[in-house]
Amino acid sequence: MARIAGINIPPQQHSEIGLTAIFGVGRNRARKICDACGIAYSKKVKDLTDLELEKIRDQVAQFTIEGDLRRETTMNIKRLMDIGCYRGFRHRRGLPMRGQRTRTNARTRKGPRKAAQSLKK
């Protein structure tokens, strides 16, 4: 099993798809890494040689990935909340921050519906 950037890459997957198991590496970046290393997208991870894996590790090391990327994202959101801007306020409240409607919809961001309060006296 190939281990790149502290992540076990599934051996039965194609190299392009397997690289997307790393947080911060999507299909586009995985293709660029494969191109830079001279590896076919369709080559299975289990068929990669040690030299090819080393080339991939060198390419992946150039990007911000995994823990560093997660930490950076968290710090950016925390900074928005600290300065009190609109986006930070929406993050704090758990609401969408890009102008979507919230009267209906937005269930993913708001979570499951809360039971309606009855108006009995």
Curated annotation (Swiss-Prot):
- Keyword check for Hydrolase, yes or no: no
Q: Which Pfam families match?
A: Ribosomal_S13 (PF00416)
Q: Which Gene3D superfamilies match?
A: 1.10.8.50, 30s ribosomal protein s13, domain 2
Q: Which domain of life is it from?
A: Bacteria
Region (Disordered), start-end ranges: 93-121
Alphabetically list the UniProt keywords: Ribonucleoprotein, Ribosomal protein, RNA-binding, rRNA-binding, tRNA-binding
Q: Name one GO biological process term.
A: translation
Query: Is Ribonucleoprotein found in the keyword set?
Result: yes
Q: Which GO terms describe its cellular component?
A: cytosol; small ribosomal subunit
The molecular function GO annotations come to:
rRNA binding; structural constituent of ribosome; tRNA binding
Q: Which residues form a coiled coil?
A: none
Self-association state and partner proteins as the record states: Part of the 30S ribosomal subunit. Forms a loose heterodimer with protein S19. Forms two bridges to the 50S subunit in the 70S ribosome.
Family assignment from sequence similarity: Belongs to the universal ribosomal protein uS13 family.
Per its UniProt record, what PANTHER family does this chain match?
A: 30S RIBOSOMAL PROTEIN S13/40S RIBOSOMAL PROTEIN S18 (PTHR10871), SMALL RIBOSOMAL SUBUNIT PROTEIN US13M (PTHR10871:SF1)
Give the protein's biological function: Located at the top of the head of the 30S subunit, it contacts several helices of the 16S rRNA. In the 70S ribosome it contacts the 23S rRNA (bridge B1a) and protein L5 of the 50S subunit (bridge B1b), connecting the 2 subunits; these bridges are implicated in subunit movement. Contacts the tRNAs in the A and P-sites.
- Protein name (Swiss-Prot/TrEMBL): Small ribosomal subunit protein uS13
Annotated source species: Albidiferax ferrireducens (strain ATCC BAA-621 / DSM 15236 / T118) (Rhodoferax ferrireducens)
